[in-house]
Amino acid sequence: MSDTKSNAMWGGRFAAGPDAIMEAINASIGFDRRLARQDIDGSRAHAAMLAQQGILSSKDAEAIREGLLTVLSEIETGQFAFSAALEDIHMNVEARLKELIGEPAGRLHTGRSRNDQVATDFKLWVRDQLDAADAGLLALLRALLAQAEAGADWVMPGFTHLQTAQPVTWGHHMMAYVEMFARDRGRMQDARARMNECPLGAAALAGTSFPLDRDATAQALGFDRPAANSLDAVSDRDFALEFLAAASICAMHLSRMAEELVIWSSAQFRFVTLSDRFSTGSSIMPQKKNPDAAELIRAKIGRIVGANVALLTVMKGLPLAYSKDMQEDKEQVFDAADTLMLALAAMEGMVRDMTANRASLEDAAASGFSTATDLADWLVRELNLPFRDAHHVTGTLVAMAEAKGCDLPDLSLAEMQSVHGAIRADVFEVLGVHNSVASRTSYGGTAPSQVRAQVARWKERLG
């Protein structure tokens, strides 16, 4: 342990300085320096409010404002010397401000604690990330809509259990992802609206005796209102957890689509050709074109889900109000946000540049007994069979075709009638994949008319 008296800004109560190991475990400047702009924005708003309330002289407020702008410039240009001994971004900024303007720097913290300061900084940062995610999702949605519009009537197999189920259209499949990512965007927007309450002025946990105007600082920082309970304001990390939860669901959707692109771009499927710009090669096999962007999205998603679980685990046992455990909130969120933004950008680029191979899609749709359900529906509609009986007849015909090595449309009428004598020649009309998708005109169905209507609706909604 150090024998010298602590010179930390909180060191008045301590007779000795912290051990080097204590300094190492306590310091967060290695990562929370990312909050520099938000920290300085919050301090500028706080100083302006203190002056407005007569707590700080206008002269001191101006010196603080100018000094903070200088500090921000030094940080943004790489000239700022961060110190681990000063623990965090708040103390680093304040110490440098004191070097620049002297005694007025010590007045900035009036009516404020690092507890409400960091909660405000972190909220501002997460809010910025929600806005960035919204922009990334919007770009991805527009890329998906372009694919859907181009392939509204391109028939492809729809799958369950990764086995051919029913024919759908390329546009319909793309629109499924539009719906997913639009929900993700809605979750991000909901989280942003809910978190837009300002903790600044809550002080350590109980509020302050200084006559602060918390509405003024909230407005200056773009919040809707000040947080209503000072204890909750400094204890709350729901905003970070909501961001991580929304990011985790979005990440899961990105991973599902990445998985499909990996499969679809394989030589065994050939459904899509990925752009060279989002593929890599092999160091030994010259023929290889690997879907590495999609594979890396699929892999990186675990970091986002892991961050969500990690922060839940940090917060689950904490009494109110602040505990040092909460310092561990930021690295998880920083990494998750970085990963999400990169994954969104990579997916948008892949979707924008990829080419759907229409011939391969339609060839695959025409195999695998994809119109078996259409046959069963025809038996119900035209022959008035109960669906379970129609299901059995169709299954028998599928087994017959499978034994012959052909598909349902390749069976003769006589072969079909050997299973059910009332089957007529017009049954073959429903066995074509184009007729199948065209018939699915229910709202939200795969019929090209429905797909085009959904594309138009979403284009209008997104602007």
UniProtKB/Swiss-Prot annotation:
It comes from the Bacteria. One of its GO terms (cellular component) is cytosol. HAMAP family: Arg_succ_lyase (MF_00006). Belongs to the lyase 1 family. Argininosuccinate lyase subfamily. This is Argininosuccinate lyase. Disulfide bonds: none annotated. One of its GO terms (biological process) is L-arginine biosynthetic process. The lineage of its organism: Bacteria, Pseudomonadati, Pseudomonadota, Alphaproteobacteria, Rhodobacterales. One of its GO terms (molecular function) is argininosuccinate lyase activity. The keyword Cytoplasm applies. Pathway: Amino-acid biosynthesis; L-arginine biosynthesis; L-arginine from L-ornithine and carbamoyl phosphate: step 3/3. Its main location: cytoplasm.
